Swiss-Prot record:
Filamin repeats lie at residues 1-67, 71-163, 199-293. There is a cross-link at residue 160 (Glycyl lysine isopeptide (Lys-Gly) (interchain with G-Cter in ISG15)). This is Filamin-B. Homodimer. Interacts with FLNA, FLNC, INPPL1, ITGB1A, ITGB1D, ITGB3, ITGB6, MYOT, MYOZ1, PSEN1 and PSEN2. Interacts with MICALL2. Interacts with RFLNA and RFLNB. Interacts with HTLV-I viral p13 protein. Interacts with ASB2; the interaction targets FLNB for proteasomal degradation. Keywords: Acetylation, Actin-binding, Cytoplasm, Cytoskeleton, Isopeptide bond, Phosphoprotein, Repeat, Ubl conjugation. It comes from the Eukaryota. Belongs to the filamin family. It comes from Oryctolagus cuniculus (Rabbit). Connects cell membrane constituents to the actin cytoskeleton. May promote orthogonal branching of actin filaments and links actin filaments to membrane glycoproteins. Anchors various transmembrane proteins to the actin cytoskeleton. GO terms for cellular component: cell cortex; cytoskeleton; Z disc. One of its GO terms (biological process) is actin cytoskeleton organization. PROSITE patterns: FILAMIN_REPEAT.
Length: 294
């Protein structure tokens, strides 16, 4: 409460959260000369409240109010990030990485990706924190900044990801920035025990695939496609390429995170090829694929 000793005028208040956001607040008169400032905090940590009367701070303003237990504020030093998407990727293909906030208490997460193209960015909650997905459209170096609970970077941030592949957008400015902000809630690591439930055994019908390499290829050039086994339980991915006479020179499979595989292959001659993609013993939907090399 604030006392004004009978002076007439306007009281107004502003609440600043630890991350610098201005929170909405309501000033109400409890009785003549006594006011209450109410706000709903979205972050733990020290909030600063400016209370002004006719534009000047009242005695004691700005007030400091702690929300949550000490040490419970979103502490960026306790947040970690990992995953292939922090190191690199390919244009037009979604890269992803994970952010673990279980040790940090609630805070606002901000992810900024700066590089040669805008990226389509998406974020999903996971039991441990967040999964961030982004699709770069031009090759080059991207700086990925991850901040938590305010203006401070988490450990290792900014990360530098090297993206290869063709440029899929017209030349833009040299530096494009994309960012997302997520208001986090408390996550305790006890939630992670759910991920220990054994996954249903294998189901090849749940594997999906996409990419030009499933239908066409060119002599001496890399063809690629993406296979997503994330919903198919546990098994191994087997790839075979069968050509007219010469064996396929090179077939490589790279796990790009959470059971998604990027497969590339190079063919040596023209003709009809058969491409088999199996999850354990069973063909995935669409397999065997027929690939024509002109």
């Amino acid at each position: 409460g604030t006392r004004l000793n009978g002076a007439k005028g306007k009281i107004d208040a502003k609440v600043h959260s630890p991350s610098g956001a201005v929170e909405e607040c309501h000033v109400s008169e409890l009785e003549p000369d006594k006011y209450a400032v109410r706000f709903i905090p979205h972050e733990n940590g020290i909030h600063t409240i400016d209370v002004k009367f006719n534009g000047s701070h009242v005695v004691g303003s700005p007030f400091k109010v702690r929300v949550g237990e000490p040490g419970q504020a979103g502490n960026p030093a306790l947040v970690s990030a990992y995953g292939a998407g922090l190191e690199g990727g390919t244009t037009g293909i979604q890269s992803e990485f994970f952010i673990n906030t279980t040790r940090a208490g609630p805070g606002t997460l901000s992810v900024t990706i700066e590089g040669p193209s805008k990226v389509k960015m998406d974020c999903q909650e996971t039991p441990e924190g967040y999964k961030v997905m982004y699709t770069p459209m031009a090759p080059g170096n991207y700086l990925i900044g991850v901040k938590y609970g305010g203006p401070n970077h988490i450990v290792g941030s900014p990360f530098k990801a090297k993206v290869t592949g063709q440029r899929l957008v017209g030349p833009g400015s040299t530096n494009e920035t994309s960012s997302i902000l997520v208001e986090s809630v408390t996550r305790s690591s006890t939630e992670t025990c759910y991920s220990a439930i054994p996954k249903a055994s294998s189901d090849a019908s749940k594997v999906t695939s996409k990419g030009a390499g499933l239908s066409k290829a060119f002599v001496g050039q890399k063809s690629s496609f993406l296979v997503d086994c994330s919903k198919a339980g546990s098994n191994m991915l087997l790839i075979g390429v069968h050509g007219p006479t010469t064996p396929c020179e090179e077939v490589s499979m790279k796990h790009v995170g959470s059971q998604q595989y990027n497969v590339t292959y190079v063919v040596k001659e023209r003709g009809e090829y058969v491409l088999a993609v199996k999850w354990g013993e069973e063909h995935i939907p669409g397999s065997p694929f027929h690939v024509t090399v002109p």
